[in-house]
Amino acid sequence: MTLGDLAFEETGKFAGIRALPDGKVEATYQGTGKLFGADYSSIYTGVATPHGGTLIAEFNGICTTKDGDTIVVWAHGRGRPTGSGLKASWRGGVIWKASSPKFARLNSLPGMWGVGHR
């Protein structure tokens, strides 16, 4: 795999959003997609912190393939608001932890992700 190769593609929606007392926002996201061609479903929970006109987010998740393989996900990123509410353009990094030999190569690959920047 080389820089710029597409490892995964996902679509989904926020399943819940909660404002925290310190101005942060907690969100849960559920999605489906393909990881190296394998279908999977995912769930992530994270916290976004306002910072200098942007949002900084950290979240954890788990992806489960149709074959029952699981991949743990840790990701972080920065979002720039693009309109009202929580709409933002996001970019960030991801680290995977796969226990299945089928996805073991993820354990040595840092990844990048983006939303709303096309």
Tell me the role of every PLM-derived stretch:
Residues 1-118:
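Beta-strand-enriched cores of mature, soluble protein domains
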